[in-house]
Protein backbone atom coordinates (compact mmCIF):
# COMPACT_ATOMS: atom_id res chain seq x y z
CA UNK A 1 0.00 0.00 0.00
CA UNK A 2 1.26 3.52 -0.80
CA UNK A 3 2.25 5.78 2.07
CA UNK A 4 -0.33 8.32 3.20
CA UNK A 5 1.04 11.58 1.84
CA UNK A 6 -1.46 14.38 1.26
CA UNK A 7 0.27 16.71 -1.22
CA UNK A 8 -2.17 19.61 -0.79
CA UNK A 9 -2.00 19.56 3.00
CA UNK A 10 1.78 19.25 3.01
CA UNK A 11 2.18 22.00 0.41
CA UNK A 12 -0.08 24.40 2.31
CA UNK A 13 1.90 23.81 5.50
CA UNK A 14 5.24 24.74 3.94
CA UNK A 15 7.03 28.07 4.36
CA UNK A 16 8.74 29.92 1.53
CA UNK A 17 11.84 28.02 0.45
CA UNK A 18 13.98 31.03 1.36
CA UNK A 19 12.92 30.74 5.02
CA UNK A 20 14.96 28.45 7.25
CA UNK A 21 12.52 26.73 9.62
CA UNK A 22 12.49 23.40 11.41
CA UNK A 23 10.99 20.58 9.34
CA UNK A 24 7.54 19.37 10.40
CA UNK A 25 6.75 15.74 11.14
CA UNK A 26 4.88 15.56 7.81
CA UNK A 27 7.90 16.91 5.93
CA UNK A 28 10.20 14.40 7.62
CA UNK A 29 7.80 11.55 6.79
CA UNK A 30 7.74 12.58 3.12
CA UNK A 31 11.53 12.87 2.91
CA UNK A 32 12.07 9.55 4.67
CA UNK A 33 9.52 7.71 2.51
CA UNK A 34 11.33 8.72 -0.69
CA UNK A 35 14.84 8.42 0.73
CA UNK A 36 15.45 12.15 0.41
CA UNK A 37 16.61 12.31 4.03
CA UNK A 38 19.84 10.59 2.88
CA UNK A 39 20.66 9.29 6.38
CA UNK A 40 24.19 8.25 5.34
CA UNK A 41 25.06 11.91 4.70
CA UNK A 42 25.04 13.17 8.27
CA UNK A 43 26.57 16.59 7.52
CA UNK A 44 24.05 17.57 4.84
CA UNK A 45 21.51 20.30 5.55
CA UNK A 46 18.18 20.12 3.74
CA UNK A 47 15.10 22.27 3.32
CA UNK A 48 11.61 21.84 1.82
CA UNK A 49 9.56 24.91 0.90
CA UNK A 50 7.60 26.59 -1.86
CA UNK A 51 7.63 29.55 -4.22
CA UNK A 52 5.05 31.14 -6.49
CA UNK A 53 5.08 31.03 -10.30
CA UNK A 54 2.05 32.47 -12.09
CA UNK A 55 -0.93 30.71 -10.47
CA UNK A 56 1.12 27.78 -9.20
CA UNK A 57 2.57 27.01 -5.80
CA UNK A 58 5.78 25.22 -6.72
CA UNK A 59 7.35 23.02 -4.04
CA UNK A 60 11.14 22.80 -3.99
CA UNK A 61 13.92 21.23 -1.93
CA UNK A 62 17.53 22.13 -1.35
CA UNK A 63 20.44 20.15 0.09
CA UNK A 64 23.81 21.56 1.18
CA UNK A 65 26.94 19.51 1.83
CA UNK A 66 29.76 21.00 3.84
CA UNK A 67 31.54 23.68 1.79
CA UNK A 68 29.82 23.20 -1.59
CA UNK A 69 31.81 24.57 -4.53
CA UNK A 70 29.06 24.54 -7.22
CA UNK A 71 25.36 23.68 -7.52
CA UNK A 72 23.18 21.17 -9.35
CA UNK A 73 19.66 22.23 -10.34
CA UNK A 74 17.36 19.32 -11.21
CA UNK A 75 14.32 19.26 -13.53
CA UNK A 76 12.31 16.03 -13.44
CA UNK A 77 10.43 14.28 -16.23
CA UNK A 78 6.74 13.97 -17.06
CA UNK A 79 4.82 11.96 -14.41
CA UNK A 80 7.88 12.23 -12.13
CA UNK A 81 8.56 14.28 -9.01
CA UNK A 82 11.52 15.10 -6.76
CA UNK A 83 10.93 12.05 -4.61
CA UNK A 84 12.16 9.77 -7.39
CA UNK A 85 15.50 11.56 -7.83
CA UNK A 86 17.44 10.52 -4.73
CA UNK A 87 20.20 8.84 -6.77
CA UNK A 88 20.95 12.08 -8.63
CA UNK A 89 20.68 14.16 -5.44
CA UNK A 90 23.12 11.81 -3.69
CA UNK A 91 25.55 11.94 -6.63
CA UNK A 92 25.40 15.74 -6.66
CA UNK A 93 26.22 15.88 -2.96
CA UNK A 94 29.08 13.40 -3.47
CA UNK A 95 30.43 15.80 -6.12
CA UNK A 96 30.43 18.62 -3.58
CA UNK A 97 27.44 20.41 -5.11
CA UNK A 98 24.58 22.11 -3.37
CA UNK A 99 21.44 20.58 -4.92
CA UNK A 100 18.16 22.32 -5.74
CA UNK A 101 15.09 20.66 -7.26
CA UNK A 102 11.38 21.37 -7.63
CA UNK A 103 8.19 19.59 -8.60
CA UNK A 104 6.80 20.91 -11.88
CA UNK A 105 3.19 22.21 -11.89
CA UNK A 106 0.73 19.33 -11.77
CA UNK A 107 3.36 16.96 -10.38
CA UNK A 108 4.37 15.74 -6.95
CA UNK A 109 3.68 18.28 -4.22
CA UNK A 110 3.19 21.29 -6.52
CA UNK A 111 -0.23 22.71 -7.35
CA UNK A 112 -1.95 22.64 -10.74
CA UNK A 113 -4.13 20.17 -12.68
CA UNK A 114 -2.52 16.75 -12.43
CA UNK A 115 0.03 15.98 -15.14
CA UNK A 116 -1.13 18.93 -17.23
CA UNK A 117 0.10 22.31 -18.41
CA UNK A 118 -1.40 25.10 -20.52
CA UNK A 119 1.75 25.78 -22.54
CA UNK A 120 5.36 24.65 -22.25
CA UNK A 121 6.23 28.33 -21.78
CA UNK A 122 4.98 27.87 -18.21
CA UNK A 123 7.82 25.42 -17.63
CA UNK A 124 10.26 28.17 -18.63
CA UNK A 125 8.67 30.42 -16.01
CA UNK A 126 9.23 27.68 -13.42
CA UNK A 127 12.89 27.40 -14.43
CA UNK A 128 13.26 31.19 -14.11
CA UNK A 129 11.69 30.91 -10.66
CA UNK A 130 14.12 28.14 -9.74
CA UNK A 131 17.05 30.34 -10.78
CA UNK A 132 15.64 33.12 -8.59
CA UNK A 133 15.43 30.71 -5.64
CA UNK A 134 19.07 29.76 -6.24
CA UNK A 135 19.97 33.47 -6.07
CA UNK A 136 17.98 34.00 -2.88
CA UNK A 137 19.67 30.99 -1.29
CA UNK A 138 23.03 32.25 -2.58
CA UNK A 139 23.89 28.83 -3.99
CA UNK A 140 27.50 28.62 -5.14
CA UNK A 141 28.21 29.15 -8.82
CA UNK A 142 28.37 27.71 -11.37
CA UNK A 143 24.88 26.25 -11.46
CA UNK A 144 24.88 23.01 -13.43
CA UNK A 145 21.47 22.15 -14.87
CA UNK A 146 20.23 18.54 -15.15
CA UNK A 147 16.99 17.54 -16.85
CA UNK A 148 15.47 14.10 -17.43
CA UNK A 149 13.10 13.70 -20.41
CA UNK A 150 10.61 16.61 -20.16
CA UNK A 151 13.05 18.20 -17.71
CA UNK A 152 15.65 17.91 -20.46
CA UNK A 153 13.19 19.56 -22.86
CA UNK A 154 12.86 22.50 -20.47
CA UNK A 155 16.64 22.79 -20.19
CA UNK A 156 17.31 22.65 -23.93
CA UNK A 157 14.51 25.18 -24.57
CA UNK A 158 16.31 27.52 -22.17
CA UNK A 159 19.62 27.02 -23.97
CA UNK A 160 18.08 27.66 -27.39
CA UNK A 161 15.93 30.68 -26.59
CA UNK A 162 17.09 32.52 -23.47
CA UNK A 163 19.84 35.10 -23.13
CA UNK A 164 23.24 33.92 -21.96
CA UNK A 165 23.13 33.14 -18.23
CA UNK A 166 26.51 33.89 -16.60
CA UNK A 167 25.59 31.75 -13.57
CA UNK A 168 25.00 28.62 -15.66
CA UNK A 169 27.64 25.89 -15.80
CA UNK A 170 27.16 22.69 -17.83
CA UNK A 171 23.75 21.41 -18.88
CA UNK A 172 23.06 17.67 -18.61
CA UNK A 173 20.26 16.22 -20.76
CA UNK A 174 19.14 12.71 -19.77
CA UNK A 175 16.99 11.10 -22.50
CA UNK A 176 15.78 14.57 -23.53
CA UNK A 177 12.33 14.93 -25.05
CA UNK A 178 11.96 16.51 -28.46
CA UNK A 179 9.50 14.10 -30.03
CA UNK A 180 8.03 11.13 -28.18
CA UNK A 181 8.07 7.73 -29.83
CA UNK A 182 5.30 7.17 -32.40
CA UNK A 183 4.57 10.91 -32.39
CA UNK A 184 2.64 10.96 -35.68
CA UNK A 185 0.18 8.35 -34.40
CA UNK A 186 -0.13 10.13 -31.05
CA UNK A 187 -0.79 13.46 -32.73
CA UNK A 188 -3.53 12.00 -34.94
CA UNK A 189 -5.14 10.43 -31.86
CA UNK A 190 -4.95 13.78 -30.08
CA UNK A 191 -6.67 15.61 -32.95
CA UNK A 192 -9.45 13.01 -32.99
CA UNK A 193 -9.97 12.95 -29.22
CA UNK A 194 -9.41 16.51 -28.01
CA UNK A 195 -12.94 17.74 -28.72
CA UNK A 196 -14.53 14.82 -26.89
CA UNK A 197 -12.33 13.93 -23.90
CA UNK A 198 -10.09 15.87 -21.55
CA UNK A 199 -7.99 12.90 -20.48
CA UNK A 200 -7.35 9.22 -21.04
CA UNK A 201 -6.09 6.60 -18.57
CA UNK A 202 -2.34 6.42 -18.19
CA UNK A 203 -0.52 3.33 -19.41
CA UNK A 204 2.53 2.47 -17.31
CA UNK A 205 5.57 1.31 -19.27
CA UNK A 206 8.66 -0.67 -18.34
CA UNK A 207 10.91 2.35 -18.79
CA UNK A 208 13.73 1.14 -16.54
CA UNK A 209 15.74 -2.03 -16.11
CA UNK A 210 15.34 -1.78 -12.33
CA UNK A 211 12.33 -3.97 -11.35
CA UNK A 212 12.19 -2.52 -7.82
CA UNK A 213 11.75 0.98 -9.26
CA UNK A 214 9.00 -0.17 -11.62
CA UNK A 215 7.17 -1.89 -8.76
CA UNK A 216 7.44 1.21 -6.57
CA UNK A 217 6.12 3.59 -9.22
CA UNK A 218 3.22 1.38 -10.22
CA UNK A 219 1.98 0.32 -6.78
CA UNK A 220 3.68 2.20 -3.93
CA UNK A 221 4.07 5.83 -5.02
CA UNK A 222 1.12 7.97 -3.84
CA UNK A 223 2.22 10.92 -6.01
CA UNK A 224 1.89 9.12 -9.37
CA UNK A 225 -0.75 10.53 -11.76
CA UNK A 226 -2.99 7.95 -13.41
CA UNK A 227 -4.19 10.05 -16.37
CA UNK A 228 -2.85 11.58 -19.58
CA UNK A 229 -4.57 14.96 -20.11
CA UNK A 230 -5.13 15.92 -23.74
CA UNK A 231 -4.15 19.50 -22.79
CA UNK A 232 -0.58 18.36 -22.10
CA UNK A 233 -0.37 16.60 -25.47
CA UNK A 234 -1.65 19.76 -27.15
CA UNK A 235 0.96 21.87 -25.38
CA UNK A 236 3.65 19.42 -26.52
CA UNK A 237 2.43 19.57 -30.12
CA UNK A 238 2.77 23.37 -30.11
CA UNK A 239 6.21 23.21 -28.47
CA UNK A 240 7.91 20.72 -30.81
CA UNK A 241 8.05 23.12 -33.83
CA UNK A 242 9.52 25.80 -31.54
CA UNK A 243 12.45 23.51 -30.75
CA UNK A 244 12.92 21.92 -34.17
CA UNK A 245 12.82 25.36 -35.81
CA UNK A 246 15.18 27.06 -33.37
CA UNK A 247 18.51 28.50 -34.48
CA UNK A 248 21.70 26.64 -33.64
CA UNK A 249 23.40 27.33 -30.31
CA UNK A 250 26.99 27.63 -29.11
CA UNK A 251 26.11 25.82 -25.87
CA UNK A 252 27.70 22.39 -25.38
CA UNK A 253 25.32 20.20 -23.35
CA UNK A 254 26.19 16.75 -22.09
CA UNK A 255 23.62 14.34 -23.54
CA UNK A 256 23.02 10.83 -22.17
CA UNK A 257 20.75 8.57 -24.23
CA UNK A 258 19.73 4.96 -23.79
CA UNK A 259 19.39 2.97 -26.99
CA UNK A 260 16.68 0.75 -25.45
CA UNK A 261 14.53 3.85 -24.83
CA UNK A 262 10.95 3.21 -25.99
CA UNK A 263 9.52 6.51 -24.69
CA UNK A 264 11.19 9.22 -26.77
CA UNK A 265 12.05 8.96 -30.46
CA UNK A 266 15.76 9.19 -29.79
CA UNK A 267 16.76 8.21 -33.34
CA UNK A 268 14.96 11.38 -34.48
CA UNK A 269 15.89 13.56 -31.52
CA UNK A 270 19.65 12.96 -31.27
CA UNK A 271 20.51 14.14 -34.80
CA UNK A 272 18.45 17.29 -34.22
CA UNK A 273 20.24 18.03 -30.95
CA UNK A 274 23.65 17.33 -32.47
CA UNK A 275 22.87 19.86 -35.22
CA UNK A 276 21.56 22.48 -32.80
CA UNK A 277 24.49 22.04 -30.41
CA UNK A 278 27.62 21.37 -32.46
CA UNK A 279 29.70 21.21 -29.26
CA UNK A 280 27.48 18.65 -27.52
CA UNK A 281 29.09 15.57 -25.99
CA UNK A 282 26.93 12.46 -26.29
CA UNK A 283 27.07 9.20 -24.33
CA UNK A 284 24.92 6.41 -25.76
CA UNK A 285 24.15 3.44 -23.52
CA UNK A 286 23.01 0.40 -25.56
CA UNK A 287 21.13 -1.32 -22.71
CA UNK A 288 19.61 1.71 -21.01
CA UNK A 289 15.89 2.44 -21.20
CA UNK A 290 14.21 5.82 -20.79
CA UNK A 291 14.22 6.52 -17.07
CA UNK A 292 17.96 7.02 -16.75
CA UNK A 293 17.67 8.57 -13.28
CA UNK A 294 16.36 5.22 -12.05
CA UNK A 295 18.12 2.75 -14.33
CA UNK A 296 20.08 -0.23 -12.98
CA UNK A 297 23.00 0.78 -10.79
CA UNK A 298 25.70 -0.20 -13.26
CA UNK A 299 24.10 1.97 -15.96
CA UNK A 300 23.76 4.90 -13.58
CA UNK A 301 27.41 4.55 -12.65
CA UNK A 302 28.39 4.53 -16.33
CA UNK A 303 26.91 7.95 -16.97
CA UNK A 304 27.88 9.32 -13.55
CA UNK A 305 31.50 8.43 -14.42
CA UNK A 306 31.11 10.20 -17.77
CA UNK A 307 29.71 13.31 -16.06
CA UNK A 308 32.24 13.26 -13.23
CA UNK A 309 35.11 13.57 -15.71
CA UNK A 310 33.50 16.66 -17.25
CA UNK A 311 32.33 18.41 -14.10
CA UNK A 312 35.29 17.86 -11.77
Residue ranges of model-derived segments:
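Catalytic nucleophile-loop/oxyanion-hole region of alpha/beta-hydrolase
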Residues: 78-84, 107-138
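Alpha/beta-hydrolase-fold enzymes
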Residues: 146-231
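An N-terminal hydrophobic leader/cap segment in hydrolases
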Residues: 1-52, 58-64
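Conserved alpha/beta-hydrolase
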Residues: 89-113
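Catalytic active-site module of serine/aspartate enzymes centered on a nucleophile-bearing elbow/loop
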Residues: 280-312
Amino acid sequence: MPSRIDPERLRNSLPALSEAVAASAETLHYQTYYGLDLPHRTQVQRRLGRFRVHDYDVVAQAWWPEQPHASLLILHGYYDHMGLYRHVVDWGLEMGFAVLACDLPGHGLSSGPRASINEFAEYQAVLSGLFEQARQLDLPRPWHLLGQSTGGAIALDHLLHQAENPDLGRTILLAPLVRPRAWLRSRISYELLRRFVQQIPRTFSENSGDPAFLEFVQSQDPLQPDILPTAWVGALSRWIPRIEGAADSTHAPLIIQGEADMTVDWQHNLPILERKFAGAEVLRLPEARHHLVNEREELRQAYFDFLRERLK
